[in-house]
Structure formats: C-alpha cells, structure tokens
C-alpha cells in the first residue's frame, strides 16, 4: 500500500489512516480476535486486499518500544518497569552534547514552553536576505560618506590622494575651514610635470600680490625647505592643521626633485603629500585638507597634546617670533636630517646663502628677511589675511 505514495516524501493523511487500519486488523488477528477483526473491516468499509505481517505485528512491536521508553523516563523510572536499554537511551541522550539550536532540551520534552523567539531557526541576526538586497561593504571608503577620502594623513609621502572637491563644497573632515588661496593661484588648473620645462603655463597671483618669483621651488615628496624660506611677510595667515604639498617649478627643466631657487617663495610641506607638481596651497578644487595643508610644519605638536592654531603675524619677538622654538623635525616630516644631503641645488636663482643645512635648528634671526625676496610688487599689504 505504501507503493502508491512513493512520490511524496511525507505520507498523506489518507495513507496514514490506511496503515493504522491495517495494523489494527493485523493486531486483532494475531491476538485471536478474528470476529472483531472482520467486524472492524466491515464497519470501516475496507475494500482492499490485506497482506498480514509476521506476528506479533507492527502495532504491537511499536507499542512495546514506546512503552518501554516512556516508563524509563527520569520522572517515571522509579515507578514503572523498564529495560536497561531504555534507561541507557535516556541517560545517553541527556549526557550528549547540546544541540547548537535546541540546547539541553530533553528528547521527550520537545520544544520548550512559551512562544518561540523570532529567528529561532534562522541563524544570527542579519543573516536573512533583505527584500532590497544591498552589496556587502567590501570597499572601506564606501562607508565614509559621499566625499570620503582614505584614512591617511597627507603628511605621509606616497599615500592615497584625496578626491577632488568642487566649488564651495566644505571640506570632508575639517568643518568650517576655507581655502588658503583663491582659484586664480590654483596650480591644479594647469596640469603638468615639473620636467616639462616651458610647456607649463605660468600661474597668476591674486590681486595685490606681486609675482611669486622667477622660480618657485620644486620639492619632491619628503623634502624640506631651506631654513630661510619662512620670512615675516605673511603676517595674517592662520595656518590650519595638516601638511602642504609642493608647487610645480615652471622654470626648471631638470629631473632632480630638490631644486633650490629663490628662498622666499616656498612654505614647504613636512613630508609632501605626493609627487612634484601638486599645489602647496590648494584651492577648493583640490584636496579635502585645503585649509590644513601647511600647519604641522609651523605649529609644533606637543607630545600627547593637540595642535593649537596660532597666527604667523608679528609678535613681541619679531615678525616670526613664535617660530623660534621649532624643532628641526617639524620642518622635516618623514625624512631624517640627512636625507637630501648631496642633492644638487642647481637653480640659477639660488643667490641667498643658506646658513644651515636643511633640517637643522635655527634662531629667530634666520627666519626673517627673505620670504618676499622675489616679490617685486609693492601693492602687497600686510593687512591682507588669509584666514582659516
């Protein structure tokens, strides 16, 4: 009779009723109740052929096994007779390792009382597919906002470059800051490599400012500016946090990354943010750190402390008095004091002597006088400020 339902994994209710009726009839015959067996078949209107199994029959055998296990349960084993096999079955089941889903539920107790918690058989939270499938966050930058940048400071040379921002968009990680130079001085508008020589166009300075000298110095990543390159002629600049990047050198056709020219035109980076040809003071279209590009070179960071914004304006100690106590590594960035020794300094404008090798300490007197060496226009006013 079971052959009729081979196609279904679980027998239907009709098949279960037929099997139970067959086992009842078989049991009645094996116990000697033949009249009762025939009456049973006639009352249920059984019309199919019946094949009897071996005595005592399936129903009797099944009942004996069930009853033995039922009596050997821990709560009934002291009052009911049971076999040692049934007792061992319960003891083994209780001592077995708990299931990761059902825990220590005894075999005869089934599911615990009370409502089943949500997701009981669905694995840990979040494992179910969402009706609106979303890709996994395999790109870390996708979790950092629409204008994200790699989590690496521009002080580290060769690090990932932040994305370009447009127009008046605020910087991604520094709220409330503004660019240090207007768009007219943005060197990124005129792309090119320092080695291209005269093919680069000349940058236009902002109004009220003279030309930036015959040869803006071209420092590679990690290079330091000469000692006299920080002068008293930028009185109102509030330097924001961060590190700057070098200007391209439109007048230099050599491939040496350190070509020292007029010492008054560069406020250099302490580690460079990238290859030569990127701006020292980017406009809003450059990096998200536009207002914090030349800060760590000037503002020493105390150990364990935070930076403090201080103006580079004149003070009681002179135009750049606050710079006197600088340590050499703040002008250095990631390279040591001897990293650029021996490199040629072959710009024709190298006319002002450098009293100290790059990266060595100096006093306040060395910081004055030469910053606007090549500023030929007197229209520059000390009241012109570039505030953060």
UniProtKB/Swiss-Prot annotation:
PTM-bearing positions, type N-acetylmethionine: 1
Positions of the LisH domain: 16-48
Modification sites for Asymmetric dimethylarginine: 155, 161, 165
Residues modified as Phosphoserine: 347, 352, 355, 381, 387
Biased composition (Gly residues): 315-325
Pfam family, one: SSDP
Signal peptide: none
Ranges of biased composition (kind: Polar residues): 285-296, 373-388
Phosphothreonine modifications at: 360
Cellular location(s): Nucleus
Extent of Low complexity compositional bias: 200-209, 250-268, 346-357
Region annotated Disordered, chain positions: 101-388
Organism domain of life: Eukaryota
Keywords: Acetylation, DNA-binding, Methylation, Nucleus, Phosphoprotein, Transcription, Transcription regulation
Protein's recorded name: Single-stranded DNA-binding protein 3
Species annotation: Mus musculus
Lineage of the organism: Eukaryota, Metazoa, Chordata, Craniata, Vertebrata
The encoding gene: Ssbp3
């Amino acid at each position: 009779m079971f052959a009729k339902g081979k196609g279904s994994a679980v027998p239907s209710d009709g098949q279960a009723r037929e099997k139970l009726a067959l086992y009842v009839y078989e049991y009645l015959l094996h116990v000697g109740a033949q009249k009762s067996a025939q009456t049973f078949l006639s009352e249920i209107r059984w019309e199919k052929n019946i094949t009897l199994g071996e005595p005592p029959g399936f129903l009797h055998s099944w009942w004996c096994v069930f009853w033995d296990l039922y009596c050997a349960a821990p709560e009934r084993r002291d009052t009911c007779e049971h076999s040692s096999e049934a007792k061992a079955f319960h003891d083994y089941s209780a001592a077995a390792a708990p299931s990761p889903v059902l825990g220590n539920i005894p075999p005869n107790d089934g599911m615990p009382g009370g409502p089943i918690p949500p997701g009981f058989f669905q694995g840990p939270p979040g494992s179910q597919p969402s009706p609106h499938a979303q890709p996994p966050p395999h790109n870390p930058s996708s979790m950092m906002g629409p204008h994200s940048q790699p989590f690496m400071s521009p002080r580290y040379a060769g690090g990932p470059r932040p994305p370009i921002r447009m127009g008046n968009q605020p910087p991604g990680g520094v709220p409330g800051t503004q660019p240090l130079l207007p768009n007219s001085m943005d060197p990124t508008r005129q792309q090119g490599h320092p080695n291209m020589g005269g093919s680069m166009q000349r940058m236009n300075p902002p109004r009220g400012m003279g030309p930036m000298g015959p040869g803006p110095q071209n420092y590679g990543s990690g290079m330091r500016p000469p000692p006299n390159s920080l002068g008293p002629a930028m009185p109102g600049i509030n330097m924001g946090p961060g590190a700057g990047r070098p200007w391209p050198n439109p007048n230099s056709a050599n491939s040496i990354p350190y070509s020292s020219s007029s010492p008054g035109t560069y406020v250099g980076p302490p580690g460079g943010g990238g290859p030569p040809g990127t701006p020292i003071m980017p406009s809003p279209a450059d990096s998200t750190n536009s207002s914090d590009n030349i800060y760590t070179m000037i503002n020493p960071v105390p150990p364990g402390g935070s930076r403090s914004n201080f103006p580079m304006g004149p003070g009681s100690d002179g135009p750049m008095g606050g710079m006197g106590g600088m340590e050499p590594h703040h002008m250095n960035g990631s390279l040591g004091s001897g990293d650029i020794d021996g490199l040629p300094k072959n710009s024709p404008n190298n006319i002002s002597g450098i009293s100290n090798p790059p990266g060595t300490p100096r006093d306040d007197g060395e910081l004055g006088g030469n910053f606007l060496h090549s500023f030929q226009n007197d229209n520059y006013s000390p009241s012109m400020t570039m505030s953060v």
